[in-house]
């Protein structure tokens, strides 16, 4: 991969987008961004607070702006929020400006990876986490599939192993 094209990681919460993104950026010597962290940095508040105050729609509006700005950069790895694909504008931007990699995981692995995480606003409800994750998968998985250039199952692999798999895929391009 002579030219450093943008790499965008999409997938559900708990798929490993941020962890794998950091690994990938280190191995490829590319700059790493996490859209959720960027929103937190710009607002000075955590994602849960933004959700509480502005609602999901307000958060998603911020997300569109951040994704638009970040994807204009060259040679970056971007870990997106799990719901970023809900907005057609984000899907179009991601598809047009880089290589989109769908990090796929099972509901069981998501439950395991997120069980102690209190920073995920969609899991802070009276509905069981399994039900929430199943509903999100039903809504979002087709959207991930729609824009993915590649799909990688992350369940039984380390972040480093997934990063190497991605690099191998990119070298074949």
Curated annotation (Swiss-Prot):
It catalyses: shikimate + ATP = 3-phosphoshikimate + ADP + H(+). One of its GO terms (molecular function) is shikimate kinase activity. It comes from the Bacteria. Mg(2+) binds at residue 18. Its EC number is 2.7.1.71. Pathway: Metabolic intermediate biosynthesis; chorismate biosynthesis; chorismate from D-erythrose 4-phosphate and phosphoenolpyruvate: step 5/7. GO terms for biological process: amino acid biosynthetic process; aromatic amino acid family biosynthetic process; chorismate biosynthetic process. Binds 1 Mg(2+) ion per subunit. It holds the Pfam family SKI. Its cofactor is Mg(2+). GO terms for cellular component: cytosol. Keywords: Amino-acid biosynthesis, Aromatic amino acid biosynthesis, ATP-binding, Cytoplasm, Kinase, Magnesium, Metal-binding, Nucleotide-binding, Transferase. The keyword Transmembrane does not apply. Transmembrane segments: none annotated. It is found in: Cytoplasm. ATP binds at residues 14-19, 120, 157. Substrate binds at residues 36, 60, 82, 140. Catalyzes the specific phosphorylation of the 3-hydroxyl group of shikimic acid using ATP as a cosubstrate. NCBIfam families: PRK05057.1. Belongs to the shikimate kinase family. Monomer. This is Shikimate kinase. It comes from Buchnera aphidicola subsp. Schizaphis graminum (strain Sg). The lineage of its organism: Bacteria, Pseudomonadati, Pseudomonadota, Gammaproteobacteria, Enterobacterales.
